């Protein structure tokens, strides 16, 4: 937007300007971070005064800053400097309120100082919640300013994970075999999911080590079943086969050690579909979670494996609430090239979906990462399909590519990633020691939601 000021020689008493603003939860978070005022009374979804209700009251200075915005943008506008401001707070605003900030010129001094009446009103009733006077030094010459180059802000709130966790808490807790939870991250992750009512954990492994870990990190295991085992992965798989566990959660052991007994043809958890891992990634600024597969199990999948990988990812996307998932099959190029095998696989997967061999989603490829996610990039390259620029699910060429995509998003894109293994008789939470508490909790939530969805599809 271009702002144009009114220099001193164009001002007269009675001149008026106003600015509307809807107070959002993100506004309160940004203001708290920018000012260092972390008073919980001013944070959304936080009970700051202990009355059991969230507050989210806008700080008084936030209201005063709206006056500053009118002065700096509109009247007198760019080039204005504050000299003095008096304020009286007559009410409060909260996230979701619409406000109107107004200024009116009262007096213009020979020194170039301008006195203005300032108010902030709560709409629609126009209740005055701030009143006062400002004195500013008005600019001497005309100035036009284009704010197009100001950077945008994205608040890292991970609202999608919070929504998934809230949804999972409405479902019955899922009995989960937790394999080797004898370090703090693994044990605390399982216990937090237990406290939230998402899982009922059965801790399998070295019982003495598990109890020692619990003691060191202050976890009370009084109501939790512990199975002392020298082969916890095998025992967890056996419990799942026998129906004693509805899910498996990885603790402090290598993924290979857990996956090996799961994939045993005679005693494992195989189904007709190949097992694959799906990351559910909460990327700040996106309207919904982004799914990436496979980044953890299938190293160099062939076409048949990719078909199962794609179907597993579509099923999970539908389970978490995407009614018709848009699936972008990634390659380095957007055109089919015999020299690039991933482009051939992408084209074939698209055709398989078209012929009903993959169901439940829209599948298109090959697509580059840019034109799968960015509509403008897709249009520039002349790609006009329904998936291009709108992908909810990314199917990667191989494990290397998928792992890099997921880790770039989490470590550079400020995203958080939950993940589950599908294609087994029960979902498996393949957590990492580097996962945050939110990521571990979200993985459990996704597993519970998927299990409930799959049950209802039968």
PLM regions: where:
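Hot-dog-fold acyl-thioester-processing enzymes
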Residues: 1-80, 143
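Short, conserved secondary-structure segments in the cores of folded domains
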Residues: 7, 53, 83, 88-89, ...
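Short loop/turn motifs enriched for small/polar and acidic residues
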Residues: 90, 119-121, 330-332
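Short beta-strand or tight-loop elements
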Residues: 83-85, 99-101, 276
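A residue-level detector for short acidic-glycine micro-motifs
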Residues: 69, 89-91, 105-107, 122, ...
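Anion-binding alpha/beta catalytic cores of soluble intermediary-metabolism enzymes, centered on
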Residues: 154-202, 207-387, 392-458
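HotDog/MaoC-like acyl-thioester-processing domains
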Residues: 2-13, 94-155
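Generic structural detector for well-ordered beta-strands
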Residues: 18-23, 88, 135-137
């Amino acid at each position: 937007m271009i702002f144009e000021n009114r220099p001193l020689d164009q001002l007269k008493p009675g001149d008026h300007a106003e600015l509307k603003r809807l107070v959002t939860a993100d506004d309160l978070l940004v203001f708290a971070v920018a000012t260092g005022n972390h008073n919980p009374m001013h944070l959304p979804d936080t009970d700051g005064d202990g009355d059991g209700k969230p507050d989210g009251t806008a700080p008084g200075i936030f209201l005063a800053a709206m006056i500053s915005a009118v002065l700096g943008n509109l009247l007198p506008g760019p080039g204005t400097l504050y000299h003095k401001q008096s304020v009286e707070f007559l009410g409060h605003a909260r996230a979701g309120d619409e406000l109107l900030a107004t200024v009116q010129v009262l007096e213009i001094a020979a020194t170039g100082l301008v006195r203005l009446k300032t108010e902030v009103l709560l709409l629609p009733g126009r209740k005055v919640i701030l009143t006062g006077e400002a004195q500013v030094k008005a600019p001497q010459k005309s100035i036009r300013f284009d704010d197009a180059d100001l950077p945008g802000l994205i608040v890292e709130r991970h609202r999608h994970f919070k929504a998934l966790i809230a949804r999972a808490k409405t479902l019955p807790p899922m009995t989960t075999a937790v394999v080797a939870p004898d370090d703090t991250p693994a044990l605390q992750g399982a216990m937090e999911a237990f406290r939230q009512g998402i899982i009922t954990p059965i801790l399998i492994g070295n019982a003495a080590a598990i109890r020692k870990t619990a003691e060191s990190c202050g976890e009370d295991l009084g109501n939790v079943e512990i199975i002392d085992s020298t082969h916890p992965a095998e025992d967890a798989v056996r419990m799942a086969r026998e129906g004693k566990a509805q899910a498996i959660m990885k603790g402090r052991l290598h993924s290979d050690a857990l996956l090996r007994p799961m994939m045993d043809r005679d005693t494992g958890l195989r189904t007709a579909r190949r097992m694959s891992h799906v990351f559910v990634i909460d990327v700040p600024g996106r309207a919904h979670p982004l799914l990436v597969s496979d980044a953890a199990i299938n190293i160099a999948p062939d076409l048949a494996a990719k078909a199962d990988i794609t179907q597993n990812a579509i099923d999970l996307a539908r389970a978490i609430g995407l009614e018709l998932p848009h699936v972008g099959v990634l390659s380095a190029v957007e055109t089919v090239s015999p020299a690039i095998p991933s482009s051939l696989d992408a084209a074939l997967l698209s055709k398989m979906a078209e012929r009903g061999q993959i169901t439940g989603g829209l599948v298109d490829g090959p697509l580059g990462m840019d034109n799968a996610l960015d509509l403008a990039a897709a249009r520039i390259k002349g790609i006009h399909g329904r998936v291009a620029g709108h992908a909810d699910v990314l199917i990667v060429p191989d494990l290397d590519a998928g792992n890099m995509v997921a880790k770039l998003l989490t470590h550079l894109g400020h995203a958080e990633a939950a993940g589950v293994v599908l294609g087994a008789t029960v979902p498996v939470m393949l957590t990492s020691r580097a996962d945050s508490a939110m990521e571990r909790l979200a993985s459990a939530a996704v597993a519970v939601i998927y299990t409930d969805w799959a049950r209802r599809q039968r």
